[in-house]
Amino acid sequence: MSRSGTAGYDMSIIFSPQGKLYQIEYAFKAIKTGGLTSVGIRGKDCVVVATQKKIPDKLIDPKSVTSLYKLTDYIGCVQTGIVPDSKSQASRAIQECATFHHKFGYQIPPNVLAKRMADIAQLSTQHASARPLGVAMILIGIDDELGPQLFKVDPAGVFTGYKATAAGEKEQESTNFLEKKFKSNPQLSKDETIQVSLIVMAISTLQSVLGADLKSSDLEIGICTMDNRKFVIMTDEDIDSQLTKLAERD
């Protein structure tokens, strides 16, 4: 976008004559600059998030690089976008979870947390002294009444529930791939889902849109199931097992 076209309206949170908030548009573009792609898929008995893992330097300890965050024992998220913004938003989410539990005496439901994080993000679109976060949060958890839950919170302060969603560099390609999968297999959204199928689908989505065979060191996967309800980050050994199952299917 040319500077002459924005006429200074992109310098702060202020509407242009065309009704646009350029800082928000730039925040959405910033999500893609990290070069990572993440997906989330919800079934009847579980919900899964998967994302790429890239180590920017050979001397960095791989264990210190992550896009997956455990917000409570029962809720987790994958953050896609600018890394410092991701850490800041995840830290705030953990704080909100703790505050809710202290105030009400029970764990915060996934939809309540998603709405709260969206409200906080939306505040950054109202003040000239603030800027939107360049990150998309895909949040998962198990609701006591509604079962598996999958939400995405964007820089504009919008949160939406999904059957499947994506974020990052290959967001549109991943969305198209998932739409075809759900169209060809509508049972995913109606009947009981085997959690292995969701994990394999998440991996195959990333491999398809990236055009590469991924190793366990290239992936991070988190899952919540109706069995134990807790958010679990899969180990490299578990991911290797799923990659083997995917290879056998192909």
UniProtKB/Swiss-Prot annotation:
<dbReference type="GO" id="GO:0005737">
    <property type="term" value="C:cytoplasm"/>
</dbReference>
<dbReference type="GO" id="GO:0019773">
    <property type="term" value="C:proteasome core complex, alpha-subunit complex"/>
</dbReference>
<dbReference type="GO" id="GO:0005634">
    <property type="term" value="C:nucleus"/>
</dbReference>
<comment type="function">
    <text>The proteasome is a multicatalytic proteinase complex which is characterized by its ability to cleave peptides with Arg, Phe, Tyr, Leu, and Glu adjacent to the leaving group at neutral or slightly basic pH. The proteasome has an ATP-dependent proteolytic activity.</text>
</comment>
<dbReference type="InterPro" id="IPR023332">
    <property type="entry name" value="Proteasome_alpha-type"/>
</dbReference>
<dbReference type="InterPro" id="IPR029055">
    <property type="entry name" value="Ntn_hydrolases_N"/>
</dbReference>
<dbReference type="Pfam" id="PF00227">
    <property type="entry name" value="Proteasome"/>
</dbReference>
<dbReference type="InterPro" id="IPR001353">
    <property type="entry name" value="Proteasome_sua/b"/>
</dbReference>
<dbReference type="InterPro" id="IPR034642">
    <property type="entry name" value="Proteasome_subunit_alpha6"/>
</dbReference>
<keyword id="KW-0647">Proteasome</keyword>
<dbReference type="InterPro" id="IPR050115">
    <property type="entry name" value="Proteasome_alpha"/>
</dbReference>
<comment type="subunit">
    <text>The 26S proteasome consists of a 20S proteasome core and two 19S regulatory subunits. The 20S proteasome core is composed of 28 subunits that are arranged in four stacked rings, resulting in a barrel-shaped structure. The two end rings are each formed by seven alpha subunits, and the two central rings are each formed by seven beta subunits. The catalytic chamber with the active sites is on the inside of the barrel.</text>
</comment>
<dbReference type="InterPro" id="IPR000426">
    <property type="entry name" value="Proteasome_asu_N"/>
</dbReference>
<dbReference type="GO" id="GO:0010498">
    <property type="term" value="P:proteasomal protein catabolic process"/>
</dbReference>
<dbReference type="GO" id="GO:0043161">
    <property type="term" value="P:proteasome-mediated ubiquitin-dependent protein catabolic process"/>
</dbReference>
<keyword id="KW-0539">Nucleus</keyword>
<comment type="similarity">
    <text>Belongs to the peptidase T1A family.</text>
</comment>
<keyword id="KW-0963">Cytoplasm</keyword>
<dbReference type="Pfam" id="PF10584">
    <property type="entry name" value="Proteasome_A_N"/>
</dbReference>
<protein>
    <recommendedName>
        <fullName>Proteasome subunit alpha type-6</fullName>
    </recommendedName>
</protein>
